[in-house]
């Protein structure tokens, strides 16, 4: 069996505040865009995925220490393996490096 990787991206609407959506709903918005970019549906990708790597910075802004697992659960990726990566300003890049 050979390794297969997904390369895609999605971003939620950027605004100073989004009182209309929870943190988890914003993650789903970005995730849905990334999945659509691949020509798949969320449910199908969740079937194909073996696990996930989540990066989130910073706990203090959302007042939530478990944001990564909350997002993973909301996206339907539990109980698949997943872990969280943080590294200050390098958090996003470290997430891609870790997933590789």
Please report, for each region that a protein language model flagged, where it lies by residue.
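Active-site-proximal alpha-helical scaffold in enzymes
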Residues: 87-100
């Amino acid at each position: 069996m050979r390794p297969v990787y997904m390369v895609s991206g999605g971003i939620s609407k950027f605004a100073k505040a989004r009182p209309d959506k929870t943190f988890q709903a914003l993650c789903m918005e970005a995730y849905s865009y990334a999945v659509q970019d691949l020509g798949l549906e969320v449910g199908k990708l969740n079937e194909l995925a073996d696990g996930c790597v989540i990066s989130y910075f910073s706990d203090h802004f959302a007042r939530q220490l478990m944001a990564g697992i909350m997002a993973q659960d909301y996206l339907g990726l539990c109980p698949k393996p997943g872990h969280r990566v943080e590294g200050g300003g390098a958090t996003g890049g470290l997430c891609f490096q870790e997933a590789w």
